[in-house]
């Protein structure tokens, strides 16, 4: 937003609602080009400048409003210089420019909402591991949890309708509608894989913008109800949602849902105590109350998706589990609540008592079987976990091979440093170390035993992780303290992405 704020010259008369003229401004596509298109393989052999990019987009928008948009006239010299008609390239240019423009109202609303308040920049909250300390504090006091897959709209028109609440410019929304219908096969954009939606590699920034707008709308309603549950008792759709296009279409279904399902049990809304966590394409709802509360939220979510987002969701696929009896697969960990039993001796005057003390603790375990399956898919071991050589890396240098294995080993060690039990992590590191040795032995046409005997175990010093080195420097003389800290949980607050090996959910 700061890059092109000087170009916009927006005043207080809500000029930012008119976004359509920005599609024909050259600097918009200069920003988009610098952000993404400069790294695109489609432009490697093409002389691209801001002027030609602007003219190409202008021609493309004009063609989108006519039926014969695939015919290139003799006067389109810029298109001819750019090469023959390339549908993917034009789609890339339009989508990147569209994201730059559509982010303007979101950024302006954020700035206006934070005006007069101090903006606290907490970069550590961006880390994936920042969620786990929250779970350690909250989950031991909760009873029930539901792991829900967030459904995605099956039709692009729903996304256009969602953006109408944020963008008031009808021309821009009309252009978005034309673009989605002409240049995208919606079924190929996202594909369900193990209940997690994965975007195609085409225009990732554009698709992430659409996805985030959809999730933002969904979570704004959900969190509004979570924070103010008394609003669920309202029977009028007009006073429930401030969504213009929502009233006429599904007023009857909204009244039916909230009158029949919610107002019959007013005590249900007095103390919801609901916690919400979202990660990737899933969300977690956890509560301390009875299963009735969880079932009410379950069917509310289903009605919300079907009536508001026109997305079908099966109630049988939303499971409500008791935390003390079921584990939760969350961000590559098996998380569960474990009871730590201890006996405390209490003495009062001459009488002594033995008191059983039970404390709940969040147990985070390394999923050994899925990780071995991921290692087997990448040819580090077989299906049983026996290490094998990585033949595709045998042509690289020795240092390159060691660096590759050590990099994977360090990443896994950092990510699973918060595990309650490290034995599974040690087994994964052992598989990678032995696979590295077998790869080097294969390269030098030698056996593993002869190779290690000739070079020694110092060859694998690269596999020592950073936390081992740092803790050994902090506690050089207290070996027992060093081992105790290393065996404990260490949450790294600088992890912004998940390794492919961990991405097994």
From Swiss-Prot:
Any one GO MF annotation of this record: RNA binding
Chief place where the protein resides: plastid
Keywords: Chloroplast, mRNA processing, Plastid, RNA-binding, tRNA processing
One Gene Ontology cellular component: chloroplast
Compartment(s) where it occurs, according to its Swiss-Prot or TrEMBL record: Plastid, Chloroplast
Superkingdom in the source lineage: Eukaryota
HAMAP family: MatK
Role summary: Usually encoded in the trnK tRNA gene intron. Probably assists in splicing its own and other chloroplast group II introns.
Family: Belongs to the intron maturase 2 family. MatK subfamily.
Full protein name: Maturase K
Organism of origin: Elaeagnus umbellata
Organism classification: Eukaryota, Viridiplantae, Streptophyta, Embryophyta, Tracheophyta
This protein's encoding gene: matK
């Amino acid at each position: 937003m700061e890059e092109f704020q000087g170009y916009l010259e927006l005043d207080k008369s809500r000029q930012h609602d008119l976004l359509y003229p920005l599609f024909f401004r050259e600097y918009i596509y200069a920003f988009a080009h610098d952000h993404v298109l400069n790294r695109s393989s489609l432009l490697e052999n093409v002389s691209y400048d801001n002027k030609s990019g602007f003219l190409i987009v202008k021609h493309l928008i004009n063609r989108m409003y006519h039926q014969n948009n695939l015919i290139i006239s003799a006067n389109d010299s810029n298109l001819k210089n750019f090469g023959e008609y390339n549908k993917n390239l034009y789609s890339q240019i339009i989508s990147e420019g569209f994201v730059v423009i559509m982010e303007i109202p979101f950024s302006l609303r954020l700035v206006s909402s934070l005006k007069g308040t101090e903006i606290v920049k907490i970069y550590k909250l961006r880390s994936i591991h920042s969620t786990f300390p929250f779970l350690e504090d909250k989950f031991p006091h909760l009873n029930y949890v539901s792991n829900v897959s967030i459904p995605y709209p099956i039709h692009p028109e729903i996304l256009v309708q969602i953006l109408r609440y944020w963008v008031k410019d009808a021309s821009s929304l009309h252009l978005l509608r034309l673009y989605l219908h002409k240049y995208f096969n919606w079924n190929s954009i996202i594909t369900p894989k193990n209940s997690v939606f994965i975007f195609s590699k085409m225009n990732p920034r554009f698709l992430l913008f659409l996805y985030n707008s959809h999730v933002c709308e969904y979570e704004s309603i959900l969190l509004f109800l979570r924070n103010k549950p008394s609003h669920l008792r309202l029977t009028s759709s007009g006073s429930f949602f401030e969504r213009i296009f929502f009233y006429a279409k599904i007023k009857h279904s909204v009244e039916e849902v909230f009158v029949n399902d919610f107002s019959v049990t007013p005590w249900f809304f007095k103390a919801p105590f609901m916690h919400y966590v979202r990660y990737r394409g899933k969300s977690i709802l956890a509560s301390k109350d009875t299963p009735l509360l969880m079932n009410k939220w379950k069917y509310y979510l289903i009605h919300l998706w079907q009536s508001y987002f026109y997305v079908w969701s099966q109630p049988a696929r939303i499971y409500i589990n008791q935390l003390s009896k079921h584990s939760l697969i969350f961000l590559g960990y098996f998380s569960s609540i474990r009871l730590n039993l201890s006996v405390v001796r209490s003495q009062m005057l001459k009488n002594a008592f033995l008191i059983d003390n039970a404390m709940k603790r969040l147990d985070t375990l390394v999923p050994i079987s899925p990780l071995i399956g991921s290692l087997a898919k990448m040819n580090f071991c077989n299906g049983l976990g026996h290490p094998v050589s990585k033949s595709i890396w045998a042509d690289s240098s020795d240092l390159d091979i060691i660096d590759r294995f050590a990099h994977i080993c360090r990443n896994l060690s950092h990510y699973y440093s918060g595990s309650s039990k490290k034995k599974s992590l040690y087994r994964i590191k052992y598989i990678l170390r032995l696979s590295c040795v077998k790869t080097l032995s294969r390269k030098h046409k030698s056996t593993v035993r002869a190779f290690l005997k000739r070079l020694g175990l110092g060859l694998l010093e690269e596999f020592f992780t950073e936390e081992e080195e740092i803790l050994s420097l902090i506690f050089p003389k207290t070996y027992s303290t060093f081992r105790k800290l290393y065996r404990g949980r260490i949450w790294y607050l600088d992890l912004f992405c998940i390794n492919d090996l961990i991405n097994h959910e």
